[in-house]
Regions:
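Small-residue-rich anion-binding loops in enzyme active sites
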Residues: 1-25, 160-161, 165-170, 176-180
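Short, flexible, glycine/charge-rich loop motifs used to bind or transfer phosphoryl groups or to couple energy/partner
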Residues: 12-15, 44-45, 153
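Patatin-like phospholipase
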Residues: 18-25, 30-134, 140, 146, ...
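Active-site periphery "cap/insert" segments of enzyme catalytic domains
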Residues: 130-164
Length: 184
């Protein structure tokens, strides 16, 4: 898809006729990822901004891949819809999480999981065992969601350059993956 930007009604006074090309860096962390979705949604509303490249890690990498896939299929509106679909599916999946507030927490208005028996048990186990020991089947609910929402062929050939950083847990060295190298 050709990357063009039309003049927006919200275009800032005195800005050039050409769109402003921007690059984004998106950090990891589930709540940061959800927050970033809102920021990305707002940026994608602006015709005078054009995202040229995105670097990301963890939740930031997922946002980057979802945005790039959507953008490659239908521009900014499709990217916004892809991000909304992704985060809606993540939210729907969280309904079945064992990490829920107890009825007493709900009654008392406490939002923290600090007293959740399941959270405390998993937290203790994660300090003793590797996540791979606790998940021998290698299940990850995000895999199915990403497979459904992201078209990696479109990402590979898309107009937005992606740079996803991952760390090798054995060596501690980082590696940057680019568009054609990205998979789940």
């Amino acid at each position: 898809m050709a990357r063009t930007a039309s003049t927006s009604k919200t275009k800032r006074a005195g800005s050039a006729a050409e769109p402003l090309l921007i690059d984004l860096a998106l950090q990891g962390g589930g709540s940061h990822g959800a927050f970033s979705w809102g920021v990305l949604d707002r940026l994608l509303e602006e015709d005078w901004l054009l995202i040229e490249g995105i670097s990301g890690t963890s939740a930031g990498a997922m946002n980057a891949a979802v945005l790039a896939s959507g953008f490659a299929s239908g521009g900014a509106p499709a990217a916004r819809e892809a991000l909304a679909t992704f985060w809606r599916k993540v939210s729907d999946g969280a309904r079945f999480s064992p990490f829920q507030r107890s009825p007493l927490d709900v009654l008392m208005g406490r939002w923290s999981l600090d007293n959740s028996p399941m959270f405390l048990a998993v937290d203790m186990m994660s300090r003793i065992f590797s996540p791979y020991d606790l998940n021998p089947m290698g299940t990850n609910p995000l895999t199915a969601i990403l497979s459904e929402v992201v078209d990696f062929e479109r990402v590979s050939n898309g107009p937005i350059k992606l740079f996803v950083t991952a760390t090798n847990v054995h060596t501690g060295r980082g590696r940057v993956f680019r568009n054609p190298e990205l998979t789940i």
